[in-house]
Regions:
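Short hydrophobic alpha-helical segments of the AMP-binding
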Residues: 10-17, 21, 60, 111, ...
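Conserved AMP-binding/adenylation subdomain of ANL enzymes
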Residues: 112-129, 139-180, 188, 192-196
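Conserved pre-ATP/AMP-binding loop-to-beta segment of ANL
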Residues: 75-93, 100, 123-129
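Adenylate-forming
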Residues: 47-54, 160, 176-225
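Short, small-residue-biased leader/transition segments that mark boundaries at the very start
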Residues: 2-7
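Conserved ATP-dependent adenylate/AMP-binding module captured primarily in the ANL superfamily
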Residues: 26-56, 75, 114-131, 163-177
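Conserved AMP-binding A3 loop
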Residues: 89-115
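Short beta-strand->loop structural element characteristic of the AMP-binding/adenylate-forming
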Residues: 11, 15-46, 102-105, 132-133, ...
């Protein structure tokens, strides 16, 4: 959870300061990081100090990328630069299933268009509460969930990773009004439900039924699911 909060805060801070944020996977190999850092023209890499490694140090040294430990950064300044619509804000890399990941540039205007259209389509309200366990280096997690919720003033419940037991407990307690996940998450949920006693299973399924919106995205949902 702390890591997700760190990524969330740094993305917003970089854009507010007039820069372009390039969120990257914490599980990326040195080769993958080298490719992404080089293609995006990254000059500074923000990360927790415990994530530094010899491999990453070598990549950054070769590319002239300065590493900054997030815990050593100065206190935030309550000031943001005016944002122009054509200004670059995010570079999000594709998954790389058909070749090397490609960096897609999103401007302030394009993000605004995406977020406002999704808010209207999905009926986001300030009273909504949604869990966020998807990675924040893909559009689904960053835009569809995080930015839509923050834009509308809704509440985001951050997870470091998907915890099926904890998520289902909160669902049973009617904590969430919106739920967005990928098909593999729904497969894990269905498998977990089969391990529960009838009463607990009914509470969880009722919690899902009480939500106003459930979304499966990022990949095609299998017909059996």
């Amino acid at each position: 959870r702390q890591r997700q909060m760190c990524i969330r805060d740094r993305i917003i801070a970089v854009v507010a300061a007039g820069g372009i944020a390039v969120p990257l996977s914490v599980h990326a190999s040195a080769g993958e990081l080298s490719h992404c850092l080089s293609v995006a023209g990254v000059r500074r890499l923000l990360l927790p100090s415990e994530m530094r490694s010899e491999g990453l140090d070598a990549v950054c040294e070769a590319l002239g990328v300065e590493q900054l430990a997030v815990e050593d950064l100065p206190e935030p300044v309550p000031h943001a630069l005016p944002l122009a619509g054509e200004q670059g804000a995010l570079i999000v890399f594709t998954s790389g299933t058909t070749g090397k990941p490609k960096g897609v540039v999103h401007t302030v205007a394009s993000i605004s268009a995406m977020v406002t259209s999704l808010i209207e389509a999905w009926g986001w309200e300030a009273t909504d509460v949604i869990p966020l366990f998807l990675p924040l280096h893909h559009v689904h997690g960053i835009v569809n969930i995080l930015l839509c919720a923050l834009w509308r003033g809704a509440t985001v419940d951050l997870y470091a990773r998907f915890d099926v037991e904890q998520v289902c407990q909160k669902v049973a307690d009617d904590r969430y009004s919106v739920f967005m996940a990928v098909p593999t998450i729904y497969v894990k949920l269905m498998a977990y439900l089969k391990t529960l006693d009838d009463a607990t299973r009914d509470q969880v399924t009722e919690g899902f039924a009480n939500m106003r919106l459930n979304v499966s995205g990022s990949a095609a949902c299998p017909v059996p699911l």
